[in-house]
Structures are given as structure tokens and as C-alpha cells.
UniProtKB/Swiss-Prot annotation:
Activated following phosphorylation by p38-alpha/MAPK14 following various stresses. Inhibited following sumoylation. Specifically inhibited by pyrrolopyridine inhibitors. This is MAP kinase-activated protein kinase 2. ATP binds at L56, G57, L58, G59, I60, N61, G62, K63, V64, K79. The modification Phosphoserine is found at S258, S314. The gene is Mapkapk2. The modification Phosphothreonine is found at T208, T320. It comes from Mus musculus. GO terms for biological process: 3'-UTR-mediated mRNA stabilization; cellular response to vascular endothelial growth factor stimulus; DNA damage response; inflammatory response; inner ear development; macropinocytosis; mRNA stabilization; p38MAPK cascade. A motif (Bipartite nuclear localization signal 2) lies at residues 371-375. Stress-activated serine/threonine-protein kinase involved in cytokine production, endocytosis, reorganization of the cytoskeleton, cell migration, cell cycle control, chromatin remodeling, DNA damage response and transcriptional regulation. Following stress, it is phosphorylated and activated by MAP kinase p38-alpha/MAPK14, leading to phosphorylation of substrates. Phosphorylates serine in the peptide sequence, Hyd-X-R-X(2)-S, where Hyd is a large hydrophobic residue.
């Protein structure tokens, strides 16, 4: 049973954020307004919504149920998270980003007791259009074209561009987190599930007195670039699948992520085989190569991606029929494995990038710092001797 937190009086009605604006082509260096003032309602969610047992999906941190606004009968999606700092962070980052037209919109947030535990309940718009690749699989005989692939990548790119501009890395951009608002032809594609989202900070390591990076020179890289590059790698994989129907990396042994597949990802071993790639331009293949570079710091940034002619001028991209829908249909029974492989690859990448942190100055082996430390100790010893 859901109930409001004991001893709490309901606040003034939760201010619903304005509905997302229609998608607009982003300028080269967009300036985004960040939503602020997340207010969490303490009254029981059942005061305002009818909660059903229909499960719409499973997020990384909780299940998603269908609910209805009691006043308007409008349907929404409800995500339930056990209250903890990680859940609060997910809600906060998602709230900040939900103004973007290509990110699922948060309507309300509640703090309620459920089975004696404090939970956060996130009311979101209901995305009824299904997953990106399911929609392409279900097209029937209608050809899927290169121009459509370009338009889809532009939509996903706009979501990532918005996030990166407000210093958020999603870190879990994958097929099942890309959903359409409805089954209609003009439905909007949206990014969901902020369970792995991370705030990135753009500090200059050179001016930080107490730390020094040990993985690379401080002027080259701050850790935030690794988190954002994870999203760029995902864009490369999704773009590759859109253009041919199968992933660039795969497991030979039916495992979620085999050692061989891990090696291929790290070594960047993939091909553009015919017939699926015979009609795709070299320019597009080069765009994928720049997204799937093995060295994260060399990957294309989201600004570079959005400024690429294939993305920026999607209306001029040729309507070349692709093999994608046929291949996706033929390999339908293997699609769950493909999704699992990408989930595992992203998990591996997040773990790898977490290792690339900043080392405390006491543990660093910078020769200049060692010399200064030795000199400081000598001065201290001399002072003690007197």
C-alpha cells in the first residue's frame, strides 16, 4: 500500500513543468535552460493517480507501471525507486534533463511509504510507441531508408547534446532505452532510464592543487570526457545497427559478452560487409569509425556529431533502401541476445572508465612533485634540528 510519509502535510500542488517544446534543429553551440526547483510531493500518490499493476517495463533501478490521473483520466508511467542517495541522484538528473523534447518527460515526483519502506515515485509521460528497433522490425515490406536512419540519429543526438551541454552523461544509451511516444507515423523518439546517469564536472586539473591525474596528462583529459565518450560509442553502435540490421561487435559463443567480443570492442575490430553496406557511402562509414574509436578521448564529441552534414542536413541524405528491416526480422529471435551484449559492453565500459580517476598527490609519482616534497622534508628536518 502506498501512503504519504507520516507527519507530513501535503505542500502546495506540485508545479508541473511546461510540456516539451517541439523538436528544433539545434544551433552549432546551443545554449540550454536547465530546469530547477525539483519539489517532491509527500501526500499519497493514490490521492492523485490510479495505480495499476500493468508493468510497462523494467528500468535498471526499478519497474515501470501504468497509472491514470484521477482528474483527467490521462495515462502516465510510474517508476518506483527505493529511496537512497543514488535514487535521489537519478531523479534529480532526469528532472534537469526532462525539458528536452527527446528525453522522457517527468510530470510529478512523490515520496511515499511502500511496504514499510520510503520510496521515490516518478510520474512520467507514457511512451506507447515501443522500442526503436521493434518499430523497424514491424514495418512489413515498407523499405527503411538511409534518410530515415539519419533522422533517427539526429533525434538521439539531440538528446545527448542536451545532456552533455548541462554536464550529464547518460552512460546507458541502448536500444531498449529508446522509445516512441506513440504508434503514429509522426511519433517522437525519446531517451529513457537515467539509472546510470552521472553528473560530469569540467574542472581544469592543472589548477587543482591537491590532485594530479595518473592515467594521462592533466591538460589532455579530465575524467568527465570518459563518461561522455561512453554515450558517443553507443551512438556509433546504434547507427551501425540502423544501417544494416546487426551489431558491429558480437559474441561467438552465445555468451552475453565473450572474451573474444570484449577484445574486438577494445581493439575496434569490426567490418562493413556486403551486401548490407554496399550502397552506404564512405562518408557515413567514416562517421561510424569516429564514434567507435578505441581511445575514448579520440572519439567524436556530440557537437562534432551534430554538425556533421549527414546529421545536420538529414533532408538531403539519399533515400537509399537499406537491408535493416529484413535483417532485423530474420534475426528476430537473436535480438534479445544483441541487446544483452550491448548492455554488458556498456557495463564493462563504465567499470573500465571508473578506474580512470584522479590519484591523490601523495600517491602520485610525478618526478617534479617528488623533488619538491623531498626539498620540503629537508627544510622541515633542518628546522627541527634547530
Amino acid at each position: 500500500m502506498l501512503s504519504g510519509s507520516p507527519g507530513q502535510t501535503p505542500p502546495a500542488p506540485f508545479p508541473s513543468p511546461p510540456p516539451p517544446a517541439p523538436a528544433q534543429p539545434p544551433p552549432p553551440f546551443p545554449q540550454f535552460h536547465v530546469k530547477s526547483g525539483l519539489q517532491i510531493r509527500k501526500n499519497a500518490i493514490t490521492d492523485d493517480y490510479k495505480v495499476t499493476s500493468q508493468v510497462l517495463g523494467l528500468g535498471i533501478n526499478g519497474k515501470v507501471l501504468r497509472i491514470f490521473d484521477k482528474r483527467t483520466q490521462q495515462k502516465f508511467a510510474l517508476k518506483m525507486l527505493q529511496d537512497c542517495p543514488k535514487a535521489r541522484r537519478e531523479v534529480e538528473l532526469h528532472w534537469r534533463a526532462s525539458q528536452c523534447p527527446h528525453i522522457v518527460h517527468i510530470v510529478d515526483v512523490y515520496e511515499n511509504l511502500y511496504a514499510g519502506r520510503k520510496c521515490l515515485l516518478i510520474v512520467m509521460e507514457c511512451l506507447d510507441g515501443g522500442e526503436l528497433f521493434s518499430r523497424i522490425q514491424d514495418r512489413g515490406d515498407q523499405a527503411f531508408t538511409e534518410r530515415e536512419a539519419s533522422e533517427i540519429m539526429k533525434s538521439i543526438g539531440e538528446a545527448i547534446q542536451y545532456l552533455h551541454s548541462i554536464n550529464i552523461a547518460h552512460r546507458d544509451v541502448k536500444p531498449e532505452n529508446l522509445l516512441y511516444t506513440s504508434k503514429r507515423p509522426n511519433a517522437i523518439l525519446k531517451l529513457t532510464d537515467f539509472g546510470f546517469a552521472k553528473e560530469t564536472t569540467s574542472h581544469n586539473s592543472l589548477t587543482t592543487p591537491c590532485y594530479t591525474p595518473y592515467y594521462v596528462a592533466p591538460e589532455v583529459l579530465g575524467p568527465e570526457k570518459y563518461d561522455k565518450s561512453c554515450d558517443m560509442w553507443s551512438l556509433g553502435v546504434i547507427m551501425y545497427i540502423l544501417l544494416c540490421g546487426y551489431p558491429p561487435f558480437y559474441s561467438n559463443h552465445g555468451l552475453a559478452i565473450s572474451p573474444g567480443m570484449k577484445t574486438r570492442i577494445r581493439m575496434g575490430q569490426y567490418e562493413f560487409p556486403n551486401p548490407e553496406w554496399s550502397e552506404v557511402s564512405e562518408e557515413v562509414k567514416m562517421l561510424i569509425r569516429n564514434l567507435l574509436k578505441t581511445e575514448p578521448t579520440q572519439r567524436m564529441t556530440i557537437t562534432e556529431f551534430m554538425n556533421h552534414p549527414w546529421i545536420m542536413q538529414s533532408t538531403k541524405v539519399p533515400q537509399t533502401p537499406l537491408h535493416t528491416s529484413r535483417v532485423l526480422k530474420e534475426d528476430k529471435e537473436r535480438w534479445e541476445d544483441v541487446k544483452e551484449e550491448m548492455t554488458s559492453a556498456l557495463a564493462t565500459m563504465r567499470v573500465d572508465y571508473e578506474q580512470i580517476k584522479i590519484k591523490k598527490i601523495e600517491d602520485a609519482s610525478n618526478p617534479l612533485l617528488l623533488k619538491r616534497r623531498k626539498k620540503a622534508r629537508a627544510v622541515e628536518d633542518a628546522a627541527l634540528a634547530h
